[in-house]
Swiss-Prot record:
InterPro entries: Aa-tRNA-synt_II, aa-tRNA-synth_II, aa-tRNA-synth_II/BPL/LPL, Asp-tRNA-ligase_1, Asp-tRNA-ligase_1_N, Asp/Asn-tRNA-synth_IIb, AspRS_core, GAD-like_sf. Keywords: Aminoacyl-tRNA synthetase, ATP-binding, Cytoplasm, Ligase, Nucleotide-binding, Protein biosynthesis. Aspartyl-tRNA synthetase with relaxed tRNA specificity since it is able to aspartylate not only its cognate tRNA(Asp) but also tRNA(Asn). Reaction proceeds in two steps: L-aspartate is first activated by ATP to form Asp-AMP and then transferred to the acceptor end of tRNA(Asp/Asn). The gene is aspS. One of its GO terms (cellular component) is cytoplasm. GO terms for molecular function: aspartate-tRNA ligase activity; aspartate-tRNA(Asn) ligase activity; ATP binding; nucleic acid binding. Its main location: cytoplasm. This is Aspartate--tRNA(Asp/Asn) ligase. It comes from Chlorobium limicola (strain DSM 245 / NBRC 103803 / 6330).
Length: 605
């Protein structure tokens, strides 16, 4: 149970003078009033013991047999009933001390009790963490939140949020709330739309992020902005993403360069980690890895650096190879990649079959490998390779007897991603330290990419990022060679946030969009309000917005984002407790000038 600060004391009133979890040695012989929930109740031959719980912890109450009126009052109490008691704190005998409780050296002999709320039988127990379906937990979330682990998660989240605020305020950030009702943007995820009663046929949108507002705050002359910002996106749920609503630590700064922002963020994560957890940051300052390098080495722009495996490029070894599958993938834009598992060359056939199955799931046509055994190399491609090739391969990759090497070949990006997926697949072979936090920055993202379907140049990520080299780069370089001032912060394979140094120059913005096929008129139509603001004096600026929910997940070792949110939706974007979304009254629709046009009901097969 969450342990409150020792200095934390309740308001003294008729309900309580003390908290359950703060009583201990030194409290003996004191008269106290306590209020809370009946965590457990036990009848031991006339003595009734009640474990009373509040948000600070549990303490044991004793009702003695001679107190017949009290005995009768509590005898039939259900678990989770709310009571207020008066009594005297006494020390427990040495043989009855409970070392699992902070208050385990004392108990309270009850002299009076008031039953504030006699609970009905519960849909699932609070005191015992028995497996319970998520559907039931979300329907009765107010009961679920009483359970120790999730209760601690929510208190932890509150304390972390307060620490973030203090950290940023000490560095002259100004907390500013931006609008919740704003205009719809067709880019990105789907918007949640809100119809306007006063303007029939028109809609507000809930913000997917305060992106444009925070940039306009920089134009307004505020040097450093932040808020714990609610964001709304109509997208599907994942284990690390809540449908509908999430919170981010939204930040923007004027007159900064990329490294200035990195320094602020690294300091904040270090401060939170050291003060809120027992975890360790493996490298500080956080390593900076370019997009090209991270894909080559780890096959992902969200690498888990704890995994002691790196992808190696062996393209040059197979330029003149007799193995045509590899030789044909040594030209520009293609590659041959290798992943070495030390000491795993003697694994069973099932091990390799499962690995190949995973590779196919990732999009590969198969999975080539070579086992280096005492009797010599084994594997499906050994017969295609000469002895000299094998020796060069062993030397370059540092291969020894007992090792196995896996290969991928094809287009550079897809091959990197497949091998990166295999790297994660093989991570289960290693005992990764869950208390290590391996942060890194991914930098130097490409500004543009080629859209194979549309046969045109598109923006790779954020179209409002400043290109590295600014206008000169746009005028003199090939689009696919231009890099952007974009960056991601990643921890243990989880992307916490993307950010960028913004493009605050209208002339550069028009040219950047022109390369991606947009006319000046199209840019003005979509983003005119931003460009107009930038024409009236905009400072260089940049920002980032780490996910609050994901940060709590990492520090609390939670795999599911719903474990760190007080009232989350389920994976179908439903609030089971409040029965949302729900139908509304016809009069409400009429006031909004709306009619419902439902899709036809699909017949069950």
């Amino acid at each position: 149970m969450y342990r409150a600060e020792e200095s934390m004391m309740p308001l003294e009133n008729r309900f309580r003078t003390d908290y359950c979890g703060l009583l201990g040695v030194g409290s003996e012989n004191r008269s106290v009033r306590l209020g809370g929930w009946v965590h457990r109740k036990r009848d031991h031959g006339g003595l009734i013991f009640i474990d009373l719980r509040d948000h600070t912890g549990v303490c044991q109450l004793v009702i003695q047999p001679e107190q017949q009126a009290l005995f009768n009052a509590v005898e039939h109490l259900h678990a989770e009933s709310v009571i207020c008691i008066e009594g005297t704190v006494v020390l427990r005998s040495s043989e009855t001390v409970n070392t699992r409780l902070a208050s385990g050296e004392i108990e309270v002999v009850v002299s009076s009790v008031i039953i504030e709320s006699d609970a009905q039988p519960l849909p699932f127990p609070v005191a015992d963490e028995v497996p319970t379906s998520e559907e039931l937990r979300l329907k009765y979330r107010f009961i679920d939140l009483r359970r120790e682990k999730i209760h601690e998660n929510i208190i932890f989240r509150s304390r972390l949020t307060a620490m973030v605020r203090r950290y940023l305020e000490e560095r002259e950030f100004i907390e500013i709330q931006t609008p919740i009702l704003t205009s719809s943007s067709p880019e990105g995820a789907r918007d949640f739309l809100v119809p306007s009663r006063l303007h029939p046929g028109k809609f507000y949108a809930l913000p997917q992020a305060p992106q444009q507002f925070k940039q306009l705050l920089m134009v307004s002359g505020f040097p450093r902005y932040f808020q714990i910002a609610p964001c709304f996106r109509d997208e599907d749920a994942r284990a690390d993403r809540s449908p509908g609503e999430f919170y981010q630590i939204d930040m923007e700064m004027a007159f900064i360069e990329q490294n200035d922002l990195f320094e602020i963020l690294e300091g904040m994560f270090k401060h939170l980690t050291e003060n809120m957890s027992q975890k360790r940051i493996t490298q500080f300052p956080f390593p900076r890895i370019s997009y090209r390098e991270v894909m080559n080495r780890f096959g992902s722009d969200k690498p888990d650096l704890r995994i002691p495996l790196e992808i190696q490029d062996v393209t040059s070894l197979f330029v003149n190879s007799s193995f045509k599958v590899f030789a044909s993938n040594t030209k520009e834009g293609t590659c041959v990649k290798a992943l070495v598992l030390k000491g795993r060359g003697g694994e069973s056939r099932m091990f390799y079959d499962k690995a190949e199955k995973r590779a196919r799931e990732l999009g590969s046509a198969g999975l080539a490998y070579i086992q280096f055994r005492e009797e010599g190399p084994k594997g499906p491609i050994v017969k295609f390779l000469g002895e000299a090739e094998m020796e060069v391969l062993k030397e370059q990759l540092g291969l020894e007897t007992g090792d196995v090497v896996f290969f991928g070949a094809g287009k550079w990006e897809s091959t990197c991603k497949i091998m990166g997926g295999m790297r994660i697949y093989f991570a289960d072979l290693f005992d990764l330290d869950k208390d290590e936090l391996s942060f890194c920055w991914i930098v130097d993202f490409p500004m543009y990419e080629y859209n194979e379907e549309a046969k045109k140049i598109d923006f790779s990520h954020n179209p409002f990022s400043m290109p590295q080299g600014e206008m000169e780069a746009l005028e003199t370089m090939q689009p696919l060679d231009i890099l952007a001032y974009q960056y991601d912060i990643v921890c243990n394979g989880i992307e916490l946030s993307s950010g960028a140094i913004r493009n605050h120059r209208p002339d550069i913005m028009y040219r950047a969009f022109e390369i991606a096929g947009y006319t000046k008129e199209e840019v003005d139509s979509r983003f005119g309000h931003m460009i107009d603001a930038f024409k009236l004096g905009a400072p260089p600026h940049g920002g980032i917005a780490p996910g609050l929910d994901r940060m709590v997940m990492i520090l609390r070792d939670e795999q599911n984002i719903r474990e760190v949110i007080a009232f989350p939706m389920n994976q179908q974007a439903q609030d089971l407790m409040m029965s949302a979304p729900s139908e509304v009254m016809a009069q409400q629709l009429k006031e909004l000038h709306l009619k419902i046009d439902l899709p036809p009901v699909k017949e069950a097969k």
